[in-house]
Amino acid sequence: MNLLSLENITKAYTERVLLDGASFFLQEGEKVGIIGINGTGKSTLLKLAAGLEEPDTGSCTKANHVVIRYLPQTPEFDDSCTVWEHVEKKISESTQWDMEGEAKSMLRTLGIVRLEQKISELSGGQRKRLALAEILMQPCDILVLDEPTNHLDHAMAAWLEDYLKRWRGSLIMV
């Protein structure tokens, strides 16, 4: 069963066509990696798959009740917040009843232990790990990850690779 279908997609920015008649189907439990040179529409395809952008033509549909979590290439945060204030905002948006325990566990696993630290003080790798914690602590059917290992050290990239191999949901990543 297709969880996600992108059919005959066209997407252009000003006069530059990035996707022209592209089709993509993702089934339950399928893991797909997208490769290509810079500027060829990989990130655009992920944003379309995550429902963050609309195609110029074609259709993007997901199966009923499918939840998609998206990790952008460069996550954005409110730099005036502490790590924990940011996580609390995400917890308050969730319907899960025990998100606080799950969040603290995921943050520890990813090496984020100074919860009172301002986000503005985090390194690029710490920011990426915070963004990963944010999406991995919430249940979903499909993970859409745009260059999830950039800014991560070797050990954390290896941990993420192992986590994604064991993860039972569907995955699209660049």
Q: Each PLM stretch: what is its role?
A:
Residues M1-V174:
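ABC ATP-binding cassette signature C-motif
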